[in-house]
A protein has these predicted regions:
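ABC ATPase nucleotide-binding domains
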Residues: 30, 71-77, 81-225
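Conserved ABC transporter NBD signature motif
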Residues: 57-65
Length: 355
């Protein structure tokens, strides 16, 4: 592993920001640290950068223990949420700053700045000041400045949080392409699931100072290992007793479960008569219908259980109070600190592929 964190602990007073955190990162990977506020993700980033000192544990970069190395000797570039550009310096001087500190010659600095401005797609803004740039442009320049000294590791702390939604989405793709192009090992902090899933090679899910799960975006989404991950990733609803649902009646012991909208199929009452799994469908009443662009989001009540599913735009419209039939295809069962996928028995027994 190129980066290794081994049994890292960090507290701020009574608050445990990192609780025995251990994981490794391969060289050249783009890793997303994803979790709610206060979960410890930014603390991990700051300890890697040498801006915070861990209470115990080891940080290894390229086979070298960096516990005692100051931040300026770790070979790390850091991009902050607030850009942290010097407002009184031109774009050129902002990018050149780290190179001047390294006492590089003027010819090298000029060439390197030109390369980076080309890399970030802003070759003509060198003479401008930060306040003459848009938020997206400023973040690109902040990345160029971080890359200027040719670091071995790039750290990004919620780099797109201060940018509007449309530009943020464009910058995700740009960041992914840029990092692929230069091949630098990178770690970024985010609380935005879409951002982590779209950009990262692997995601580290943090919660209350601990690592809940590590995996690629598909694994994290489809195979959550803990109840927290199952609830945190995607749009999820907790069901207290899933044994009351058709196809799941044989449940024993703890019967809490998590259901996502994509696990649910909603049909108008009168359209379900010839459905192959009609006998396994629940009667429900529509509580609310919301337009979501490419589909409708329907909240419905099965007895006292509230569920949310998707409903196609080209189907007959639903409204509050309509009776519908609901097929719950699968769910995630919750058993203490683990989750398991449980498929509706009718579908599991059928030769039809329906999930």
């Amino acid at each position: 592993m190129y980066i290794e964190l081994k049994n890292i602990n960090k507290s701020f007073g009574d608050f445990k920001a990192s609780d025995n955190v251990s994981f490794g990162i391969e060289k050249g990977k783009l890793i997303g640290l994803l979790g709610p506020s206060g979960s410890g993700k930014t603390t991990i980033l700051r300890m890697l950068a040498g801006l915070e000192k861990q209470d115990s544990g080891d940080i290894i970069i390229d086979g070298k223990n960096v516990n005692k190395l100051p931040s300026n000797e770790r070979g790390i570039g850091f991009v902050f949420q607030s850009y942290a550009l010097f407002p009184f310096m031109t774009v050129y001087d902002n990018i050149a700053y780290g190179l001047k500190v390294q006492k590089k010659d003027k010819k090298f600095i000029k060439q390197r700045v030109a390369e980076l401005l080309e890399l970030v797609g802003l070759p003509d803004v060198g003479k401008r000041y930060p306040d003459q740039l848009s938020g997206g442009q400023r973040q690109r320049i902040a990345l160029a400045r971080a890359l200027a000294p040719q670091p071995e590791l790039l750290l990004l702390d919620e780099p797109f949080a201060a940018i509007d939604a449309k530009v943020r989405k464009e910058l995700r793709t740009w960041l992914r392409d840029t990092i692929d192009k230069i091949g630098i090992t990178s770690i970024f902090v985010t609380h935005d699931q879409d951002e982590a899933i779209e950009v990262a090679d692997e995601i580290v899910i943090t919660n209350r100072g601990r690592v809940e799960q590590i995996g690629n975006p598909v694994e994290i989404y489809l195979e959550p290992k803990t109840p927290f991950v199952a609830q945190f990733i995607g749009q999820s609803a907790v069901i207290e007793d899933y044994s009351k649902l058709k196809g799941f009646e044989t449940a024993e012991g703890k019967t809490s479960a998590i259901i996502r909208p994509e696990f649910i199929e909603i049909n108008k009452f009168e359209d379900s008569e010839y459905h192959p799994f009609e006998s396994s469908m629940e009667d429900a009443v529509v509580e609310d219908v919301s337009f979501r662009g490419n589909s409708f989001e329907v909240r419905a009540l099965i007895d006292n259980i509230s569920i949310t599913g998707r409903y196609p735009l080209n189907a007959s419209r639903l409204k509050k109070g309509d009776k519908v039939k609901v097929l719950i295809k699968k769910l995630y069962t919750i058993d203490e600190n683990t989750t398991n996928i449980l498929v509706n028995k009718a579908l599991d027994d059928s030769e039809l592929y329906y999930i």
